């Protein structure tokens, strides 16, 4: 009898060991994904959180109208698991969107349009040159924010000395860690792809004007920078857009948006249907 009990205990211990090993293997080797695609914005776009002057109309996301001193933001409603505390793994992601900046005058345009990654409880920050995302030109690790800015107005306190419009990568500060001069094509649709490679920590930004009529101008731009996301942003984040105007202004519109991320070593998946 004792021998049978011993055998049963041994069996259950072996079974428990195999079960725990299987669960651990599944957790380590599975991938958590988040995906969504918005090809046309609806008036009651339920998977967006609007802040400030942001709203949807006529199939577009409007962040600002061409009026002075406005801030408009829109966030994806579901938080994104951008890195995993248990495994230390960081997500690969790619997001693509089309946007238009349309100003009454091509010479007097302001201020900024940006895609950003921020804490889940993010709120609109200082407007004007601060994107509605930051409050200071100084590095502030408590900001926990990464932004890709499309800057149409020169701010001497932090912008590149060449005074050109530019694409910038911002890490916890409005002062970009890297920039690329950019020729705004007023009223033209721009296609943007932003990709993050978790193996190299390289964030890559590409902007193209597919329908440009300005043949003499550069119509494609690429910018890269090493951004250690795990050291900058929280484990769970929100992603979204922000745009601002000041004394000068422009309408800032997003016409489509898609996002896909993959985080290894977790065990859940979130998929959002096309909207």
UniProtKB/Swiss-Prot annotation:
InterPro entries: ConA-like_dom_sf (IPR013320), L-lectin (IPR016363), Lectin_LegA_CS (IPR000985), Lectin_legB_Mn/Ca_BS (IPR019825), Legume_lectin_dom (IPR001220), Leguminous_Lectin (IPR050258). One of its GO terms (molecular function) is calcium ion binding. GO terms for biological process: carbohydrate mediated signaling. Mn(2+) binds at residues 149, 151, 159, 166. Pfam families: Lectin_legB. Residues 1-30 form the signal peptide. The mature form consists of two chains, alpha and beta, produced by cleavage of the immature protein. These remain cleaved, yet fold together to form one subunit. CDD domains: lectin_legume_LecRK_Arcelin_ConA. It comes from the Eukaryota. Keywords: Calcium, Lectin, Manganese, Mannose-binding, Metal-binding, Signal. D-glucose binds at residues 111, 129, 246-247. D-mannose specific lectin. Belongs to the leguminous lectin family. Binds two manganese (or other transition metal) ions and two calcium ions per heterotetramer. The metal ions are essential for the saccharide-binding activity. This is Lectin.
């Amino acid at each position: 009898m004792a021998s049978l009990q011993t055998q049963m205990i041994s069996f259950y211990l072996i079974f428990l060991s195999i079960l725990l090993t299987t669960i651990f293997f599944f957790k380590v080797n599975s991938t958590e994904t988040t995906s969504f695609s918005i090809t046309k914005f609806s008036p009651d776009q339920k998977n967006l959180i609007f802040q400030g002057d942001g709203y949807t109309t006529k199939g577009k996301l409007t962040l600002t109208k061409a009026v002075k001193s406005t801030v408009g933001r829109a966030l994806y409603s579901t938080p994104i698991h951008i890195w995993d505390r248990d495994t230390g793994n960081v997500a690969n992601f790619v997001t693509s969107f089309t946007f238009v900046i349309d100003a009454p005058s091509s010479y007097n345009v302001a201020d900024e349009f940006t895609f950003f990654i921020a804490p889940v409880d993010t709120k609109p920050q200082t407007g004007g040159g601060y994107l509605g995302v930051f409050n200071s030109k100084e590095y502030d690790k408590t900001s926990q924010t990464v932004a890709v800015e499309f800057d149409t107005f020169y701010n001497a306190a932090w912008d590149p000395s060449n005074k050109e419009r530019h694409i910038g990568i911002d890490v916890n500060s409005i002062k970009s860690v890297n920039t690329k001069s950019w020729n705004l094509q007023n009223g033209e649709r721009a296609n943007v792809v932003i990709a993050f490679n978790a193996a190299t920590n390289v964030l890559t930004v590409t902007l193209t004007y597919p329908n440009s009529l300005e043949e003499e101008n550069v119509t494609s731009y690429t910018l890269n920078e090493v951004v250690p996301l795990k050291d900058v942003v929280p484990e769970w984040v929100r992603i979204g857009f922000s745009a601002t105007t000041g004394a000068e202004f422009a309408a800032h519109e997003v016409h489509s948006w898609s996002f896909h991320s993959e985080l290894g070593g977790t065990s859940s998946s979130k998929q959002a249907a096309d909207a």
